[in-house]
Amino acid sequence: MKKFCLSISLCLCLLMSGCGGREFAKAREDLAARLETAACLSFTANVRAEYEHKTARFTLSYYEDAQGGKVTVLAPQLIAGVSARIEPGSTSLEYDGVCLGTGELDDFGLSPMSALPMLVQALKDGDMNAGWTESGCTVLELQSTDELVCTVWFTSEDMTPRQAELRSDGRVKVFAEISDWQEGLAPAAPDETTE
């Protein structure tokens, strides 16, 4: 009788976990479809980059439309206003005049400036490795490339990204706190003024 009850319990657990997996997969599919149809996307992020022997902090704005994307430094004040363009479907940065050498965090091009385009690319077409609920947020782990995994925390109600971790070489290299997320037909370009 114990074996029978144990077997039934295991089957129920597997069925229940499968239902939750479908829920996260559906949320992932809906998010990708929503971002694919959005004409524009903009947000601000406080980014913390973890180098081998130092930590660097930036406040960056991101804006994307049919012509591509743009990352602009809002802080630190010393480099505020430096921006880079990203062609549609790419994560390679093209600087407008000034080149900002923030240093790469891995051998595959991850840097503080490239982190936001890489995150957006993962949100659009990254494969979902896992999904769970944590502190009232929906969390998805997305495999962006063979080398990059993005873990993103969303508000459960509308799947708005709130924070993200970008992991490469087995460790988290970039932390991002996301605010002012706007998507749709024509969100305003982010305010590029600094305080």
What do the PLM-derived regions correspond to, one by one?
Residues 63-118, 172-174:
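An acidic-aromatic
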Residues 41-47, 54-73, 82-84, 91, ...:
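One face of beta-strands
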Residues 13-65, 185-195:
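N-terminal leader/targeting segments and the immediate start of mature chains
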Residues 36, 47, 93-148:
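Flexible, processing/modification-adjacent segments and terminal tails
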Residues 48-52, 76-78, 98, 147, ...:
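Hydrophobic lipid-interacting interfaces of membrane-associated proteins
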Residues 33-37, 81-85, 129-131, 151-157:
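Short linear motifs in intrinsically disordered
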Residues 1-17:
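Sec-dependent bacterial lipoprotein signal peptides
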Residues 130-195:
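Gly/Pro-enriched, hydrophobic low-complexity segments
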